[in-house]
């Protein structure tokens, strides 16, 4: 039998890159993996219990909340917050920051999207959890505040996501490569399946919702015309691959190459995706895998956030593809 490496073992081995660490980050990532198992348990049997459909409320984004959204949010807060390792947390589903109980010894910040792509739950399309970890800036954990959450993405110490699909996959980085794990339900463990993931420099797929084409700016329209025009030298035309679940679309492009685009529109001039919960963690992962992520004008990880639920346009994926998209957005083509 091949040497099976669990995510817990792999995380422990990653400690060698942090000689000053005392195992805290290892415990945090292990907690996240445990929370993912709890969410996975309910996602796979959502159709058998009364957890599908709408909860009859809206979140801070003004979106209708799914029952499974609420469950995932509650499970993550409960499973992770109870240990006191995080001084402060932020969730896409909560308007304000979350101060966990016993946070006096917490030295980290957790920001997360409990269930990305939740509009797909009822039709059995892949959904996922996205998370981001930062060091606490405040010297006293008991005084952790919103300011500790509003850090640039370049300050992340770890980020990752979990996809609940035909198989359950967890991908994470601590700034030393990107690693993927597949959940084995027979033993209840995430096992290493993809070590040191690298994304192709150029792909042949693009992922975006073209339903808002009439509201796209001229740069976006010209870029779409460009990637649909035949040119063998640049592997065009590109093919569309779009699920409507950010984490699933991103994961596919990470492995196969390509670009995910959520541009500004007339209705959403500042974009629609959340900087802190979606763009930053995925940008960190993408760059660690050799890719690129921008808002069309600025590197995502350099953006200085001013709001917990700040939105941003997003161009993320293979470096060459993103750079070309930027040139169109900036009027250079």
From Swiss-Prot:
Keywords: Calvin cycle, Carbohydrate metabolism, Cytoplasm, Hydrolase, Magnesium, Metal-binding. Its EC number is 3.1.3.11. Homotetramer. It comes from the Bacteria. NCBIfam families: PRK09293.1-1. HAMAP family: FBPase_class1 (MF_01855). Pathway: Carbohydrate biosynthesis; Calvin cycle. Gene3D superfamilies: 3.40.190.80, Fructose-1,6-Bisphosphatase, subunit A, domain 1 (3.30.540.10). The keyword Metal-binding applies. The keyword Magnesium applies. Mg(2+) 1 binds at residues 92, 113, 115. One of its GO terms (molecular function) is fructose 1,6-bisphosphate 1-phosphatase activity. InterPro entries: FBPase_C_dom, FBPase_class-1, FBPase_N, FBPtase. Mg(2+) 2 binds at residues 113, 116, 278. One of its GO terms (biological process) is gluconeogenesis. Substrate binds at residues 116-119, 209, 242, 272. One of its GO terms (cellular component) is cytosol. It is found in: Cytoplasm. Belongs to the FBPase class 1 family. Binds 2 magnesium ions per subunit. This is Fructose-1,6-bisphosphatase class 1. Its cofactor is Mg(2+). PANTHER family: FRUCTOSE-1,6-BISPHOSPHATASE-RELATED, SEDOHEPTULOSE-1,7-BISPHOSPHATASE, CHLOROPLASTIC. The lineage of its organism: Bacteria, Pseudomonadati, Chlorobiota, Chlorobiia, Chlorobiales.
């Amino acid at each position: 039998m091949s040497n099976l490496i669990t995510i817990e073992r792999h995380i422990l081995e990653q400690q060698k890159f942090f000689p000053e660490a005392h195992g805290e980050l290892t415990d945090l990532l292990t907690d996240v993996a445990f929370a993912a198992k709890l969410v996975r348990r309910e996602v796979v049997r959502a159709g058998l219990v009364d957890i599908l459909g709408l909860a009859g409320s809206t979140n801070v984004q003004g979106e209708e909340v799914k029952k499974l959204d609420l469950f995932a949010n509650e499970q993550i807060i409960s499973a992770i917050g109870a240990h006191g390792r995080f001084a402060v947390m932020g969730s896409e589903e909560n308007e304000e920051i979350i101060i966990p109980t016993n946070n006096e010894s917490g030295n980290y910040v957790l920001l997360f999207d409990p269930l990305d792509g939740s509009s797909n739950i009822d039709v059995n399309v892949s959904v996922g959890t996205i998370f981001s970890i930062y060091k606490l800036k405040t010297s006293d954990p008991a005084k952790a505040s919103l300011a500790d959450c509003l850090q640039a993405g370049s300050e992340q110490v770890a980020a990752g996501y979990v996809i609940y699909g035909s198989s359950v996959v967890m991908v994470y980085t601590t700034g030393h490569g990107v690693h993927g794990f597949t959940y084995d339900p027979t033993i209840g463990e995430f096992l290493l399946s993809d070590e040191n993931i690298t994304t192709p420099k150029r792909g042949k797929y693009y992922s975006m919702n073209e339903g808002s084409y009439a509201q796209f700016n001229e740069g976006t329209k010209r870029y779409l015309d460009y990637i649909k025009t035949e040119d063998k030298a640049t592997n065009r035309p590109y093919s569309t691959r779009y699920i409507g679940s950010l984490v699933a679309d991103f994961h596919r492009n990470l492995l196969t190459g390509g670009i995910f685009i959520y541009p500004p529109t007339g209705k959403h001039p500042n974009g629609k995706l959340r900087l802190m919960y979606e763009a930053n963690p995925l940008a960190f992962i993408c760059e660690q895998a050799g890719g690129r992520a921008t808002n069309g004008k600025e590197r995502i990880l350099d953006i200085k956030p001013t709001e917990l639920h700040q939105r941003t346009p997003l161009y993320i994926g293979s470096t060459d593809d993103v750079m070309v998209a930027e040139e169109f957005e900036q009027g250079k083509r």
